[in-house]
Amino acid sequence: YDSSDSLALLDGIVDIYMPDMKYSNEVIARKYSKIPDYPRINRMALHEMSRQVGDLQLDEIGIAFRGLLVRHLVLPNDLAGSKEILRFLAEEISPNTYLNLMDQYRPCYQAGQFPELNRRVTHEEFLEVYQLAKQFGLYRLDR
């Protein structure tokens, strides 16, 4: 993940940022990805990216030319903490944030060691996150 210090060096250079928001909970991030302090650093990075490029802008034929496009992979059993991620985007970044909600999680590698992570996301779980995004006022949703 990117630190806000390294991102500051890119100010004025990058036109489009496409970060992932993987987890909203530090304990979960550490457990499954061994990423210490992920939520805090990820949020700081998104604030910096948003400051630099703002909401995603499209030209007259629908091609993005500047802005922020956030990706979020929905995990089974809400292990990503999707509600908090959606709240953060809507309230602290912008309700105009372009959000790609992804349901293509497939358990592989060491996922079998974690029964709660060792299955695909159900259609119902994905729809719940999609509806939550709309409830938070996020409307630029892509799947």
Locate each region found by the language model:
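Gly/Pro-rich active-site loop or hairpin
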Residues: G112-E124
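A cross-taxonomic marker for long C-terminal extensions/tails that follow the last structured domain
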Residues: L127-R143
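Conserved AdoMet/S-adenosylmethionine-binding subsite of the radical SAM
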Residues: Y1-P115
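Generic hydrophobic secondary-structure packing signal
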Residues: Y38-I41, E125, V129
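Short amphipathic alpha-helical segment that frequently serves as the phosphate-/nucleotide-binding helix
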Residues: K83-L86, H123, L127
